[in-house]
Amino acid sequence: MAVFHDMLLQPLGMFLCLSLQLSSATFIRYSSTCFTFDEYYTITLDIKASSHIYESNAVYSVFVPVNDSVYAVVMKTLDENSDSAGLWQRADKNCYSNSTYYVKDQYMTVLEAQWQAPEPENITEVEIQAFTVQIRALPILSTLKLREKLSTLALAAKIPQSSAFKPFFMITPKSIRLEGLANQVFSSPITEAIYILLAFLTSTLLF
């Protein structure tokens, strides 16, 4: 009877052990679906893009430097309100706020990712964030900004007007007339007295 009891308990124990292992493995796979980073380094890795001018619905190629210690790159794009924007194409794993690209070649030096800007939503600037996930170190964050190209009218509106650019107006009196001024000068009493004195002196000298 004891032998039969042991024969029943042994398979049951193995089944329970296997169930616990499968449950743990399933939990690990679920928790690692999306990367979240509480700690990371912020270092400039010279991220490049096919264009630094932001345009709605455009597709950009983003190049991130990697090495043999990097096994994944997590890409994220934020608008001016820190909301997720656009779509990362052909990613190995897409999440709500980021997308993951795995480095499948240990000799790879640059990882290329494609990002599509959203439809027009009054967005004038976005920040591309790249987290390089390393095997035995904290992830490294590098950023790159794309800005909308300013139009000529918008650029002119930003230039302050100084006094050098203000129009110059010459103010002249409207009621001044030279002829009237001459008549006033020659018709004054002093002028008449001078004329009389000159006439008297002239007549005295002649006679």
Swiss-Prot record:
Subcellular location field: Apical cell membrane
The keyword Lipoprotein belongs to this UniProt entry's keyword annotation: yes
Propiece residues: 188-207
Glycosylated sites: 67, 122
Record-linked InterPro entries: PLET1 (IPR026184)
Biological role stated in the UniProt entry: Modulates leading keratinocyte migration and cellular adhesion to matrix proteins during a wound-healing response and promotes wound repair. May play a role during trichilemmal differentiation of the hair follicle.
Protein name: Placenta-expressed transcript 1 protein
Organism: Homo sapiens
Lineage of the organism: Eukaryota, Metazoa, Chordata, Craniata, Vertebrata
